[in-house]
Amino acid sequence: MRLNTLAPAAGSKHAPKRVGRGIGSGLGKTGGRGHKGQKSRSGGKVRPGFEGGQMPLKQRLPKFGFTSRKSLVSAEVRLAELAKVSGDVVDLNSLKAANIITKNIEFVKVVLSGEINKAVTVKGLRVTKGAKAAIEAAGGKIEE
């Protein structure tokens, strides 16, 4: 086998449409675009969501809700994810170092989801009742 003998498998490639090359080709004259209209012109595209001048669905429906600014800097951490932290002290910086939370997170709450087998000390994080019981059952402790 040599580089000059390499070829794609038979039937795996389709020949491109050659438009505007005579009536006999089946794609002559209008080139498969039909007659007149916006879609037949060069650059003739209709932007997504455009409904021909009718008020679009996006504008017919009412606005609602908002994005809470607090949710952008808050995160929940599952109990099982605490095992991924190297060392036995879990705080905001150690969670960021272990890539469990992103760098813009400022508030973390530990929730009961999964299991924890190693004893860890949780510092400066909020903890749910169930998660607190599970951490203490594993030999860990919570510090404010």
From Swiss-Prot:
Region: Disordered; residue ranges are: 1-58
Keyword set, alphabetical order: Ribonucleoprotein, Ribosomal protein, RNA-binding, rRNA-binding
GO CC terms in record: cytosolic large ribosomal subunit
The record's section on Gene3D superfamilies has:
3.100.10.10
A GO molecular-function descriptor:
structural constituent of ribosome
Pfam families found in the cross-reference section = Ribosomal_L27A
Q: Which InterPro entries match?
A: Ribosomal_uL15 (IPR030878), Ribosomal_uL15/eL18 (IPR021131), Ribosomal_uL15/eL18_sf (IPR036227), Ribosomal_uL15_bac-type (IPR005749), Ribosomal_uL15_CS (IPR001196)
Q: Where is the composition biased (Basic residues)?
A: 32-44
GO biological process, any = translation
Which residue stretches does the UniProt record annotate as biased composition, category Gly residues? 21-31
Query: Quick one: signal sequence residues?
Result: none
Q: Say which family it is in.
A: Belongs to the universal ribosomal protein uL15 family.
- Share what the entry says about its subunit structure, partners included: Part of the 50S ribosomal subunit.
State the function annotated in the UniProt record: Binds to the 23S rRNA.
Classification via PANTHER family: 50S RIBOSOMAL PROTEIN L15, LARGE RIBOSOMAL SUBUNIT PROTEIN UL15M
Q: What is this protein called?
A: Large ribosomal subunit protein uL15
Q: Which organism is it from?
A: Vibrio parahaemolyticus serotype O3:K6 (strain RIMD 2210633)
Q: Which gene encodes it?
A: rplO
